[in-house]
Amino acid sequence: MSIILGVDPGSRITGYGVIQCIGRHQTYLGSGCIRTASDDLPYRLKQIFDGVSEIIRQYQPDEFAIERVFMAKNADSALKLGQARGAAIVAATNADLPVAEYSATQIKSAVVGTGKAQKSQVQHMVQQILKLPAAPQADAADALGVAICHFHTSQSLIALGGRANARTYGRYR
């Protein structure tokens, strides 16, 4: 049994999703968003760090997965996103959690079956996979998608008999 915390970082809204994995089955434990105030960036980064730290204390995950930074057209946005990721990753490493990262394409492929899926498709498939009564909010659905992607990737590595190592899917430790 393992508990996975997935995070979809953002400087304004950071989504999180927590699933429990037993064998090949995934169970929804919780999800939501860390909404930062419209203060200066350093304060927003602290809110992300504190929020992720609290979620870790609450759910006691065994593993942490986060979406990789994509190259945005706006360099300032990409830098802020990278800093938000950093705040979340530091919270995970402070709790001695292994950290894995996945691209948006990997996440969409794992959840929907195509790397070019729309947000609404990710929301729908997360709802179906986790048997939720309603589709989660977009940022929370993306974070749950990160956790689901990590679970599927981990299962694939186990099926390979350990031939692939953790670096294959961007794990830090």
From Swiss-Prot:
Quote the cellular component terms of the Gene Ontology held in the record. cytoplasm; Holliday junction resolvase complex
Q: Which Pfam families match?
A: RuvC
Record-listed E.C. numbers: 3.1.21.10
Cofactor(s) annotated in UniProt = Mg(2+)
Q: Which GO terms describe its biological process?
A: DNA recombination; DNA repair
GO MF, one term, reads: DNA binding
Q: Give the disulfide map.
A: none
Concerning its family, UniProt says: Belongs to the RuvC family.
Q: How does it assemble?
A: Homodimer which binds Holliday junction (HJ) DNA. The HJ becomes 2-fold symmetrical on binding to RuvC with unstacked arms; it has a different conformation from HJ DNA in complex with RuvA. In the full resolvosome a probable DNA-RuvA(4)-RuvB(12)-RuvC(2) complex forms which resolves the HJ.
What protein is this chain from? Crossover junction endodeoxyribonuclease RuvC
Q: Which gene holds the coding sequence for this protein?
A: ruvC
